[in-house]
Amino acid sequence: MSKSDDLFIREDPIFVDKELLEINHLPEEGRIVGRGEEIGQLANAVNPGIFGQSPSNVLIYGKTGTGKSLCAKYVSRRLVQTADEEGVSAAHAYVDCAQDGTETQAVQTIASSVNTDETDIYIPDKGISTATYYKRLWKILDAEYDVVLIMLDEIDKLEDDDILMQLSRAGEAGKLESCKIGVIGVSNKIKYKDRMDERVKSSLCEREFVFPPYDASQLNEIMVARSDAFRDGVLDDGVIPRAAALAAREHGDARKAIDILRYAGEIAQSTEAETVREEFVTQARERAETDRFRELIRGSTPHSRYVLQALTMLSINAREDETTPDNQGFRTTRVYDLYEQICRQEGSDSLSLRRVRDLLKEHAFLDIVEQSRHSGGSAEGSYTEHTLLEDPAVVKDVLADTIE
């Protein structure tokens, strides 16, 4: 036997269909748990599309891991299938706004995903103007489709509202002659609408839905529905209930629950355990928390991370001081002073105090930081305190990997 024969595991002793535990896996309807009402409401909003009529524009809110994207993708796929049965040509396009956050990136992604060989229209990755991308998109839509649903996932990550204006008013503005567009925006931020241009708000927010967090029972059911990702008999009885309880404590996040289950299996693999044991769940939860936060700050600027590092260091020092209350908040000036020290250590010029305030607001928008206003009386006036909502140890570890 050659050495290479010992390098790889030819038969996975833990997983039989690991894809069921991937976040981007779209399950069949029977595997979508606890969202029957939401799926029905969303389907009702876009139902006119199966007859070649304009679907309602929809905005979906809810915390991370509440099934928003999953249900929107499922309904979009079913609409295309049902429209085809009615003799209506339909398509759906998906944009990850965290990845394609500029207007040009987003419209290029949409045009590329709905383009077909029959159009003879070329959609390059780059090299043409935003206006040209739009012109080609409108041509493709009118040439190929009666109805198109466009899903903008993490819509709050878009740099501006320009593409929302273009899409929501394409028919009204005469950009499209026959094709009808429906937009489904998905956001983790319930206050996202407050940042919208009023004209966009009036046309995009025709229907709004809020997805509530899953409870422990629903999370348990979700993981049971995906447990055939594992080989028979490898999951100890307490694994799924334990993972469900941990995820329910963390705002009912199904994404985290599935991550924990997958990571627990991977820990069993790496330790050559014969079964996935309950003790692996706690280790898996720590890894899931780290990965979730790393994803949350993906794409943030160095100075955004320096500001967060300053608040994290203050939080860690406060925790070590037994006289300091838990969840201690810190004034902007204290955060700024430490931020300046970090900039000097990193050999970087510091930003202004005003810009650091803006960065702290951005962290608050992402629910990484909580801001509260206080009155210091006539002598001090009012001031803002910033409290880190994440585990400081997790933030410290992630920032250590991302700050060079």
Predicted regions and their residues:
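A short, basic N-terminal segment
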Residues: 1-56
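Mid-core helix/loop region of P-loop NTP-binding domains shared across ATPases and GTPases
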Residues: 2-7, 13, 99-111, 116-166, ...
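Walker A/P-loop nucleotide-binding motif
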Residues: 54-76
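C-terminal helical "lid" subdomain and adjoining coupling/linker elements of P-loop NTPases
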Residues: 59, 233, 242-303, 318-323, ...
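Conserved catalytic segments around the Walker B and adjacent sensor/switch elements
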Residues: 59, 82-99
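Short, hydrophobic-biased segments on the C-terminal half of alpha helices
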Residues: 76, 164, 357-361
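Hydrophobic residues on short alpha-helical segments
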Residues: 304-312
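Terminal-proximal interaction/regulatory segments of ATP-powered molecular machines
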Residues: 322-404
